Amino acid sequence: MKNLLLVAALTATASLCAATPDSIPFKTMDGTETSLKAYAGKVVLIVNVASRCGNTPQYAGLEILNKKFAGEGLVILGIPCNDFGGQEPGTNAEIKEFCTSKYAGTFPLLDK
């Protein structure tokens, strides 16, 4: 019985170890399913963004970084989140419109 439990525990542990952060799927705002594997060999900056946050002007700085370093392998991924004080209540379409019209954002935004 102990051997059976040991084998079960090792099997469960092995399956947990097989999942690496770059294999976890996520969606972009346009609904495309991807993972960090798509950005292999690049420097990825993951940023929590919100359009009603005191740090919202960071979009401008992020876009400057994006334009300056995208050609050198930098990828900025904006992750809109409404979990911190309800500062991102909009839909994906509203968030994208806000980013592009107010800050001329071109870096990828992920699904909220």
Task: Describe every region a protein language model picked out.
Residues 40-47, 55:
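Local sequence-structure signature of Cys/Sec-based thiol-disulfide redox active-site neighborhoods
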Residues 55-112:
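Structural microenvironment flanking redox-active thiols in thiol-disulfide oxidoreductases
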Residues 8-18:
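Hydrophobic h-region of N-terminal signal peptides that target proteins for export
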Residues 17-37:
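N-terminal "domain-start" segment that seeds a small globular fold
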Residues 47-52, 81:
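Aromatic-flanked redox-active Cys/Sec active sites in thiol-based oxidoreductases
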Residues 1-5:
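Positively charged n-region of N-terminal signal peptides that target proteins for export
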